[in-house]
């Protein structure tokens, strides 16, 4: 077999393949033997029918089509291996010569990972927002904790924001009651905005057994999206009494003896939550700083696949109803054109990030260990509320493990670069990234990039490097949702 590669663009190639007919003859012999076992021809025992008779009965062209259909995928894979091409997506294949006794010829056009000239990482610096825990934020946490230990007391007064009420609801469209839209004895915290838009405003000021009618859009059922006249009747009103924020409360609600110690602990919790956000900001700022230094060509089909994943996620929550989706966009002050433009821009940026990180992982010789994969599996399963074993089984069944592997490999590449970067906050403080990403390796990242690495960066879950180019982010999320 002979193959050659023509570079059509930085992200697309055409592979020309010629397969000598002699290489296909064993395939023909096997196909005829299988066919002979399956057919019954007068005068011949099963499996003994002559080839000439089988050709006359079923047609040589039909057999040729079957052989070619079976041969092209394997020969395409062989051509990929010989040329060391890393494809992105499925190829567009065209058979250019197919004749019995003649060489088989076909072309395959496919998107590929582009060659990326990696930037100089020497002196890479990024800036992120400074973090602090304000008194207001600490007080809000304290109020939330007090609310958990509060008691509800029934009161004889009109409803006010913050009250807990029991209500009856009914709805009508065009004067006709809406079936299944009535409910009795619903509990609601006034001001939470959890039940129906407009409900909180409608109940404030009402006393027990008083009613009010307001207009709201129905979210589900046969009348979903239509305006309905909603009637709400207040059945009871309770207010929450909060414990005093003193030492006694601190001992009741925590392991601390004093309210000052509890406040200090809450302040640290606020800071810790902000550190998580700061770590993500460092990650994104590091990638953005790299993208500013390098040009990353983007395969259009790869971007399109990413966009379709975004659209699929957006539509899945409304039963893939595109008409309703377009209406919701208009209600939110947007449009389908604006959504498509924003989604495509975001998809292109995501693809650039993925391709850049794959190239970095190659040059940094990133190795993904079992511990790295296990950690990601546990974190993802917690995020979606399922058991790690359940998620692993789903990923394996749906061939999503290579995507998760690729995602973890990219994260390790970002981690390595962030460890070597100089990170400061907007107040001018230098941030110790080891708190987020651990200590840097003994060999500096910039030294590794200067090495004459051949790009063979370990193996993926299937034992080769091809799948490191997969768009893992969306796939992993979809897989986790499916497993749930």
Swiss-Prot record:
Disulfide bonds: none annotated. One of its GO terms (biological process) is chaperone-mediated protein folding. It comes from the Bacteria. The keyword Lipoprotein does not apply. Residues 162-243 form the PPIase FKBP-type domain. The keyword Transcription does not apply. Keywords: Cell cycle, Cell division, Chaperone, Cytoplasm, Isomerase, Rotamase. It is found in: Cytoplasm. Its EC number is 5.2.1.8. Gene3D superfamilies: 3.10.50.40, Trigger factor ribosome-binding domain (3.30.70.1050), Trigger factor, C-terminal domain (1.10.3120.10). It is an enzyme of class 5 (isomerase). SUPFAM superfamilies: FKBP-like (SSF54534), Triger factor/SurA peptide-binding domain-like (SSF109998), Trigger factor ribosome-binding domain (SSF102735). It catalyses: [protein]-peptidylproline (omega=180) = [protein]-peptidylproline (omega=0). GO terms for molecular function: peptidyl-prolyl cis-trans isomerase activity; protein folding chaperone; ribosome binding. Transmembrane segments: none annotated. InterPro entries: PPIase_dom_sf (IPR046357), PPIase_FKBP_dom (IPR001179), Trig_fac (IPR005215), Trigger_fac_C (IPR008880), Trigger_fac_C_sf (IPR037041), Trigger_fac_ribosome-bd_bac (IPR008881), Trigger_fac_ribosome-bd_sf (IPR036611), Trigger_fact/SurA_dom_sf (IPR027304). Pfam families: FKBP_C, Trigger_C, Trigger_N. Residues 427-484 are annotated as: Disordered. Residues 444-476 have a biased composition (Acidic residues). One of its GO terms (cellular component) is cytoplasm. Involved in protein export. Acts as a chaperone by maintaining the newly synthesized protein in an open conformation. Functions as a peptidyl-prolyl cis-trans isomerase. Consists of 3 domains; the N-terminus binds the ribosome, the middle domain has PPIase activity, while the C-terminus has intrinsic chaperone activity on its own. Belongs to the FKBP-type PPIase family. Tig subfamily. This is Trigger factor.
């Amino acid at each position: 077999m002979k193959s050659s590669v023509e570079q059509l663009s930085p992200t697309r190639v055409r592979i020309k393949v010629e397969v000598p007919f002699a290489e296909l003859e064993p395939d023909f012999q096997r196909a005829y033997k299988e066919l002979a076992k399956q057919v019954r021809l007068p005068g011949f025992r099963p499996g003994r029918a002559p080839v000439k008779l089988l050709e006359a009965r079923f047609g040589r062209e039909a057999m040729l089509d079957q052989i070619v259909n079976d041969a092209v995928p394997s020969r395409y894979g062989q051509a990929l291996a010989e040329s060391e091409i890393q494809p992105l997506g499925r190829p567009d294949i065209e058979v250019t010569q197919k004749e019995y006794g003649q060489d088989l010829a076909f072309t395959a056009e496919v998107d590929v990972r582009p060659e990326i000239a990696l930037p100089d990482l020497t002196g890479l610096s990024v800036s992120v927002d400074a973090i602090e825990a304000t008194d207001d934020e600490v007080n809000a946490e304290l109020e939330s904790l007090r609310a958990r230990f509060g008691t509800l007391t029934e009161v004889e007064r009109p409803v006010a924001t913050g009250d807990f009420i029991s209500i009856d609801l009914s709805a009508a469209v065009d004067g006709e009651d809406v079936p299944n839209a009535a409910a009795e004895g619903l509990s609601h915290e006034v001001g939470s905005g959890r039940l129906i838009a407009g409900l909180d405003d409608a109940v404030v000021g009402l006393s027990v057994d008083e009613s009010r009618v307001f207009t709201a859009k129905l979210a589900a059922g046969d009348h979903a999206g239509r305006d309905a006249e909603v009637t709400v009747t207040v059945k009871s009103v309770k207010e929450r009494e909060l414990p005093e924020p003193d030492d006694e409360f601190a001992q009741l609600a925590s392991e601390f003896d004093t309210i000052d110690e509890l406040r200090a602990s809450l302040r640290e919790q606020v800071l810790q939550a902000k550190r998580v956000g700061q770590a993500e900001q460092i990650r994104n700022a590091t990638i953005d700083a790299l993208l500013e230094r390098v040009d990353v060509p983007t395969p259009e089909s790869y971007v399109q696949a990413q966009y379709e994943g975004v659209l699929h996620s957006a539509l899945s929550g409304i039963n893939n109803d595109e008409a309703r989706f377009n209406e919701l966009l208009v209600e939110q002050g947007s449009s389908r054109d604006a959504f498509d433009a924003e989604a495509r821009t975001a998809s292109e940026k995501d693809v650039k990030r993925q391709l850049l990180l794959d190239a970095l992982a190659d040059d940094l010789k990133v190795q993904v260990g079992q511990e790295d994969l296990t950690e990601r599996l546990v974190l993802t399963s917690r995020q979606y509320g399922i058991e790690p074993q359940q998620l692993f089984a789903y990923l394996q069944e749906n061939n999503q493990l290579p995507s998760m592997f690729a995602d973890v490999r990219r994260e390790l590449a970002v981690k390595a670069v962030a460890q070597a970067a100089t990170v400061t906050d907007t107040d001018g403080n230098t941030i110790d990234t080891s708190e987020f990403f651990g200590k840097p390796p003994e060999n500096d990242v910039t030294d590794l990039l200067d090495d004459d690495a051949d790009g063979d960066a370990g193996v993926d879950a299937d034992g080769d490097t091809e799948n490191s180019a997969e768009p893992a982010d969306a796939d992993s999320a979809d897989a986790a949702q499916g497993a749930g």
